[in-house]
């Protein structure tokens, strides 16, 4: 079985074609037929739903008690402000959580670059517009930034942290947000050729990130996630094989061999097989009297068997505990 697996093609060519700082096309070939869709779909799902990243998950705004409020002098209502905050691409380089602030007075346009960072944060899209203030406008916010995986769902947070929610300060607005740094993913499968084989696949993945990581790193991380999830299956087989080997090592290797290896006469060999004696370990546990009860096996055949066993330092009537091993015959 493993010989056939080793003979399967593995991709030899990996091309990364950068179309912009945050957008790239990755080409992988050649792949065995069907593996283009198998790998492409798996990587696409991971890239969209299971990538680690950072996002703003909570906002406290002076004078605001709930998300359906409005702020004097601010063109956007609170719902729009929260939507704009969701689009801020922020990178945490230190720790898993941080607090940043934003304090501005109008008239002005407030952008992501106005967020006051502490140590270990970086805004990737500082030009993003968050709000527009007139001469009466004033915006003071404290923002919570967290690292996570996939999608941050406020409803789920409330369900699992009801006690904490009851104790929280009024005015802290939870934000549904995606931690994934990947914005768009698409994959295509085309035909590939290697020598005379024309039934192979070429996988092309197009992806765009928010800039907190580049496209090549995103592919590398997603492949590592997939590899780690599948590793349990590899370990399972490895542990099973190791257990089988340990069980087999409890017995002399000679006992695990077929009685055919004893090179008995045809008559003696046929008599043993008729009694379901297939391995030398089966044979040595039989006594002389038991063998003599075997049809067509006489004293001459018995003597032959005893002599052959003796030449291998074995004898009839041996006691073997835990025989046969469960893996015998596999």
Swiss-Prot record:
EC number(s) from the headed UniProt entry: 2.7.7.6
Top enzyme category: transferase
Region (Alpha C-terminal domain (alpha-CTD)): 251-330
Region (Alpha N-terminal domain (alpha-NTD)): 1-237
Disulfide bond annotation, renumbered to this chain: none
CDD domains in the cross-refs: RNAP_alpha_NTD
Superkingdom of the source species: Bacteria
GO molecular function per UniProt: DNA binding; DNA-directed RNA polymerase activity; protein dimerization activity
InterPro entries: DNA-dir_RNA_pol_insert, DNA-dir_RNA_pol_RpoA/D/Rpb3, DNA-dir_RpoA, RBP11-like, RNAP_asu_C, RNApol_insert_sf
Cellular component GO terms, alphabetical: cytoplasm; DNA-directed RNA polymerase complex
Catalytic activity: RNA(n) + a ribonucleoside 5'-triphosphate = RNA(n+1) + diphosphate
Keywords per UniProt: DNA-directed RNA polymerase, Nucleotidyltransferase, Transcription, Transferase
GO biological process, one term: DNA-templated transcription
Subunit text: Homodimer. The RNAP catalytic core consists of 2 alpha, 1 beta, 1 beta' and 1 omega subunit. When a sigma factor is associated with the core the holoenzyme is formed, which can initiate transcription.
Protein family: Belongs to the RNA polymerase alpha chain family.
Domain observations: The N-terminal domain is essential for RNAP assembly and basal transcription, whereas the C-terminal domain is involved in interaction with transcriptional regulators and with upstream promoter elements.
Entry function: DNA-dependent RNA polymerase catalyzes the transcription of DNA into RNA using the four ribonucleoside triphosphates as substrates.
Name of the featured protein: DNA-directed RNA polymerase subunit alpha
Organism of this sequence: Legionella pneumophila (strain Corby)
GN (gene name): rpoA
């Amino acid at each position: 079985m493993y010989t056939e697996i080793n003979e399967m093609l593995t991709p030899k060519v990996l091309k990364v074609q950068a179309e912009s700082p945050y957008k790239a096309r990755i080409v992988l070939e050649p792949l065995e037929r069907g593996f283009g869709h198998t790998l492409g779909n798996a990587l696409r799902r991971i890239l969209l739903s299971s990538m680690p990243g950072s996002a703003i998950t909570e906002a406290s705004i002076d004078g605001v008690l709930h998300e359906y409020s409005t702020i004097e002098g601010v063109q956007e209502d609170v719902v729009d402000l929260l939507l704009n905050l969701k689009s801020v691409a922020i990178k945490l380089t230190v720790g898993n959580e941080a607090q940043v602030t934003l304090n501005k007075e109008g008239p002005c346009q407030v952008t992501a670059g106005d967020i006051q960072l502490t140590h270990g944060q970086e805004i990737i899209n500082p030009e993003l517009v968050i709000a527009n203030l007139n001469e009466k406008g004033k915006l003071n916010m404290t923002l919570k930034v967290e690292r996570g995986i996939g999608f941050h769902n406020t409803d789920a947070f409330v369900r699992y942290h009801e006690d904490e929610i009851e104790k929280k300060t009024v005015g802290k607005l939870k934000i549904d947000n995606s931690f994934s740094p990947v914005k768009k993913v698409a994959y295509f499968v085309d035909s590939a050729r290697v020598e005379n084989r024309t039934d192979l696949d070429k996988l092309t993945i197009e992806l765009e990130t928010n800039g907190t990581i580049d496209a090549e790193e995103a592919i590398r991380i997603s492949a590592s996630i997939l590899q780690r999830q599948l590793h349990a299956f590899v370990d399972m087989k490895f542990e099973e094989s190791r257990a089988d080997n340990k069980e087999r090592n409890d017995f002399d290797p000679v006992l695990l061999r077929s009685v055919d290896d004893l090179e008995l006469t045809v008559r003696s060999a046929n008599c043993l097989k008729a009694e379901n004696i297939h391995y030398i370990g089966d044979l040595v546990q039989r006594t002389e009297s038991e063998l003599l009860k075997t049809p067509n096996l006489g004293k001459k055949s018995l003597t032959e068997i005893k002599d052959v066993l003796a030449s291998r330092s074995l004898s009839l009537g041996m006691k073997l505990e835990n025989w046969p091993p469960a893996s015998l015959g596999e």
